[in-house]
Swiss-Prot record:
It comes from Mannheimia succiniciproducens (strain KCTC 0769BP / MBEL55E). PROSITE patterns: G_TR_1, G_TR_2. GO terms for biological process: positive regulation of translation. InterPro entries: EF-4, EFG_III/V, EFG_V-like, EFTu-like_2, G_TR_CS, LepA_C_sf, LepA_CTD, LepA_IV. CDD domains: EF4_II (cd03699), EF4_III (cd16260), LepA (cd01890), lepA_C (cd03709). GO terms for molecular function: GTP binding; GTPase activity; guanosine tetraphosphate binding; ribosome binding; translation elongation factor activity. Its EC number is 3.6.5.n1. GTP binds at D14, H15, G16, K17, S18, T19, N131, K132, I133, D134. It catalyses: GTP + H2O = GDP + phosphate + H(+). It holds the Pfam family GTP_EFTU. This is Elongation factor 4. The gene is lepA.
Length: 599
């Protein structure tokens, strides 16, 4: 056990985590050169296309160190994007150490900081590593100072390497063996194993990734899931070298996968503890805090026949992604669907894309909203995650919106642009610290403004150099109103949105104009209105198409023409009473893009 090392790799987006993992696997001979491909651990097609890591993956490698001993390295590659920080905290719960990878050209960024603090809070040994030293822009000395200054860990001795060219990879491995402590645990104690991740395999059922903290997990054991008390038989277990390799037992301190023929998706929740049935452990391992979704949106299948398939797909996906929340919802415009909770917009996009690809569904998404705390006139407090659930205005005493604390690292030359953006998003500055050329800014910005398009706008105003990390701070009273969109006098529930009163006329007008372009013309006028309660704040009309009924009248009497026009008018009137308007899919997506192009 003294030769086991469990560690994660944490870093900002694009600082080279996945490439470093590739090199470690290659150096330790986990895969032959023929099987090696770039980003070997990013197994989803989506991860490869976007070039980001979404799911944490684990690998077990054997490394023969310079002192002649062979060490077993279990490492977990983690995502860097702010929406997936829960994946990082799950991976860290299974480790004793973490490699903090920093790009020697870019330096420290917000995510580097956030993930590093998570690791330090969990009492892990953090080993700094400067990557990409082969770049002409690399300045390892400056970056090492930056790490000491901003993060506050000793980085003068940090290993300098280049994952792309393979320089310094041996030093990284030696550093892991020297600096990261061996796992603590008692092989003779009752079994305790932490479930780090689970996913659904069509042949094996539920596969769980576990870290054995105490005791030994053997094939054929009867095990018990501590939170549900259900017992299962261990059918197969083993490790990833990235390939799935079967073993007969997982020893204390090891990380591996387990299959116990669990058919039920909720059978082995992530963060739970496995123990043996005959000699159960007395206490549960401390898991990790459940993450609260920050953004809610309605997802509806385009054809209602897909509802069952959609429900199954969500179940399977939520097993693999513990932070996805969903509950059934009905909408008068869109039929049956689900209200889903996500960690951010990227998370929402990825879930939607995974549902469409992996499960072959066609979905409509409604506009994302955040959760509001609403105090009613009778003193009750309710939480509203969808505009259609907001009670009538005269029953509400106040609405409180969620405020996010945003930590940004910005180069000096873009400071002005970023501050302007934050003010426009109703932000309040709480702190500002200079670190050399970088400035650490702290703002409190309403969550509703952050989740919509703040990240994209921040990147574009700073040419991609500013970085962001945000977390929920508190609820704060604000003047929020619900804007309803009415088409021909009928409210379309899926298009409603909750906005700040000052922005309402402007958002309403923009949305109405956008809808006008998207709704196809009919034989009669279509009125599109935005309203707060009964007060109309914006209107626009999609003009009717009309046939020239006088074409056949060459000369003729004026009364004849009047008669024909009158007849047409009556027909249109009758049509307008009976006609209903089809709202195309693009119109629902229009809400997302309001305010983006106009600025």
């Amino acid at each position: 056990m003294k030769n086991i090392r469990n560690f994660s790799i944490i870093a900002h987006i694009d600082h080279g985590k996945s490439t470093l993992s590739d090199r470690l696997i290659q150096t330790c001979g986990g895969l032959s050169d023929r099987e090696m491909e770039a980003q070997v651990l990013d197994s989803m097609d989506l991860e490869r296309e976007r070039g980001i890591t979404i799911k944490a993956q684990s690998v077990t490698l054997n490394y023969k160190a310079k002192n002649g001993e062979t060490y077993q390295l279990n490492f977990i590659d983690t995502p860097g994007h702010v929406d997936f920080s829960y994946e990082v905290s799950r991976s860290l719960a299974a480790c004793e150490g973490a490699l903090l990878v920093v790009d020697a050209g870019q330096g420290v960024e917000a995510q580097t900081l956030a993930n590093c603090y998570t690791a330090i809070e969990m009492n892990l040994e953090v080993v700094p590593i400067l990557n990409k030293i082969d770049l002409p822009a690399a300045d390892p000395e400056r970056v090492a100072e930056e790490i000491e200054d901003i993060v506050g860990i000793d980085a003068m001795e940090a290993v300098r390497c280049s994952a792309k060219t393979g320089v310094g990879i041996e030093d990284v491995l030696e550093e892991i063996v020297a600096k990261i402590p061996a796992p603590k645990g008692d092989p003779n104690a009752p079994l305790q194993a932490l479930i780090i991740d689970s996913w659904f395999d069509n042949y094996l059922g539920v596969v769980s990734l576990v870290r054995v903290k105490n005791g030994v997990l053997r094939k054929g054991d009867k095990i018990k899931v501590m939170s549900t008390g259900q017992t299962y038989n261990v059918d197969r277990l083993g490790i990833f070298t990235p390939k799935q390799v079967d073993k007969n037992e997982l020893e204390c301190g090891e990380v591996g996968w387990v299959v116990c023929a669990i058919k039920d998706i909720l059978g082995a929740p992530v963060g739970d503890t496995l123990t043996s049935q005959h000699n159960p452990a007395s206490s549960v391992l401390p898991g990790f805090k459940k993450v609260k979704p920050q953004v809610y949106a309605g997802l509806f299948p385009v054809s209602s026949d897909d509802y069952e398939a959609f429900r199954d797909a969500l179940g399977k996906l939520s097993l693999n992604d513990a932070s996805l929340f969903y509950e059934p919802e009905t909408s008068t415009a869109l039929g049956f669907g689900f209200r889903c909770g996500f960690l951010g917009l990227l998370h929402m996009e990825i879930i939607q894309e995974r549902l469409e690809r992996e499960y072959d569904l066609d979905l409509i998404t409604t506009a994302p909203t955040v959760v509001y705390e609403v105090e009613l006139t009778n003193g009750d407090v309710i939480y509203v995650d969808s505009p259609s659930k907001l009670p009538p205005l005269n029953n509400i005493s106040e609405i409180r919106e969620p405020i996010a604390e945003c930590n940004m690292l910005v180069p000096q030359e873009y400071l002005g642009n970023v501050i302007t953006l934050c003010v426009e998003k109703r932000g309040v500055q709480t702190n500002m610290v200079y670190h050399g050329n970088q400035i650490a800014l702290t703002y409190e910005i309403p969550m509703g403004e952050v989740v919509l398009d703040f990240f994209d706008r921040l990147k574009s105003t700073s040419r991609g150099y500013a970085s962001l990390d945000y977390s929920f701070k508190r609820f704060q009273a604000a003047d929020m109103v619900r804007v309803d969109i009415m088409i021909n006098g009928e409210r379309v529930d899926a298009l409603a949105l909750i906005v700040h009163k000052d922005n309402a006329p402007y958002r309403g007008r923009e949305l109405v104009e956008k809808m006008k372009e998207l709704i196809p013309r009919q034989q009669f006028d279509i009125a599109i209105q935005a309203a707060i309660g009964n007060h109309i704040i914006a209107r626009s009309t999609v003009k009717q198409l009309r046939k020239n009924v006088l074409a056949k009248c060459y000369g003729g009497d004026v009364s004849r023409k009047k008669k024909l026009l009158q007849k047409q008018k009556e027909g249109k009137k009758r049509m307008k009473q009976l006609g209903n308007v089809e709202v195309p899919q693009e119109a629902f997506l229009a809400i997302l893009h309001v305010g983006k192009d106009s600025k």
